[in-house]
Amino acid sequence: MKQRKLRAGDMALIGMFAALMAVGANITSVAPFLQVAGIPLSMQPFFCLLAALLLGSKRAAIAMIVYALVGLAGAPVFAQFSAGFAPFAGKSGGFIISYIPAAFAAGWFLERNIQPSKIRFLIASLIGTAIMYLIGTTYMYLALKLWIHTPVSYGTAWGFMIWFMVKDTALAVILSFIAPAIYRSIHKATGFNRNHISST
């Protein structure tokens, strides 16, 4: 039986997307105008979905895990160059966690078809976005209510996130149109296949 494993090329891609997540968390450091009501926007959902659509479920999820663990270990890769456990305990900590199942689910849905259509890319992107916001917003509500002790309703929490969700949904739609071409270019140049972990 052939054993499926990650090769050096797989690990390089995983590391690259973990690094892109760090860049996405702090995009306002180079583009300070990317804010809504004084709150910095993040490109992390975009890079999370891009990882899922290009790398597939397992590699993308591993990339998100690596990103979370690197930050938890003390590297300043989270928003506002924060690190450690504190960002997980904050109101946006749920989004850091959500990237893992979102990347896996979007990648898994895409892998159900060897040659997925743009519609399938779109649905995969929307599935990933929905998971991010379901987990992230619910976590934010619980954090505010249970340990930050800020009285807020679940509906208010969703209302606060609506503009961010609109932005990330729009980016997901755009991504679903450009990701197929990017993947085909990578596949043609390297033979990379998102549906399979390298085997020996």
From Swiss-Prot:
It comes from the Bacteria. One of its GO terms (molecular function) is biotin transmembrane transporter activity. The keyword Thylakoid does not apply. The keyword rRNA-binding does not apply. It is found in: Cell membrane. GO terms for cellular component: plasma membrane. The chain crosses the membrane at residues 13-33, 36-56, 61-81, 90-110, 121-141, 158-178. Keywords: Cell membrane, Membrane, Transmembrane, Transmembrane helix, Transport. It is a multi-pass membrane protein. Belongs to the BioY family. Putative biotin transporter. This is Putative biotin transporter BioYB.
